[in-house]
Amino acid sequence: MNLTCMMIVAVLFLTAWTFVMADDSNNGLANLFSKSRYEMEDPEPSKLEKRKTCQRRWDFCPGALVGVITCCGGLICLGVMCI
């Protein structure tokens, strides 16, 4: 009984906290779907999108040490090159 009351109070507190902390300064819920997909997309790719996701054959791959860059296709990073 005591645990149940504590759980109910905790859920009510967290729900109230969520509503208080929600940023709805621009009436975000009403404007959530107002823009079309084309208007929401950035016409120019960002720097992250321009970056290669994988290294090609004979490319430098320091990712073997850091774990960031991987080789494309079935290639493996041997030393510092994708082979």
UniProtKB/Swiss-Prot annotation:
* Cleaved signal peptide residues: 1-22
Task: From the UniProt record, list the residues forming the propeptide.
Answer: 23-50
Q: Which SUPFAM superfamilies match?
A: omega toxin-like
Q: Which molecular-function annotations from GO does this UniProt entry contain?
A: ion channel inhibitor activity; sodium channel regulator activity; toxin activity
Q: Where is it localised?
A: Secreted
Q: Which residues pair up as cystines? A: 54-72, 61-77, 71-82
Xref: Pfam families = Conotoxin (PF02950)
Main localization is secreted
**Keywords from the UniProt entry:** Cleavage on pair of basic residues, Disulfide bond, Ion channel impairing toxin, Knottin, Neurotoxin, Secreted, Signal, Toxin, Voltage-gated sodium channel impairing toxin
Q: Which GO terms describe its cellular component?
A: extracellular region
Q: In which tissues is it expressed?
A: Expressed by the venom duct.
InterPro entries cross-referenced by the UniProt entry: Conotoxin
**Has keyword NADP?**
no
- Report the superkingdom from the record: Eukaryota
Role this protein plays: Mu-conotoxins block voltage-gated sodium channels (Nav).
Present the record's domain note. The presence of a 'disulfide through disulfide knot' structurally defines this protein as a knottin.
UniProt record similarity statement: Belongs to the conotoxin O1 superfamily.
Name the UniProt record assigns to this protein: Mu-conotoxin-like PnMKLT1-014
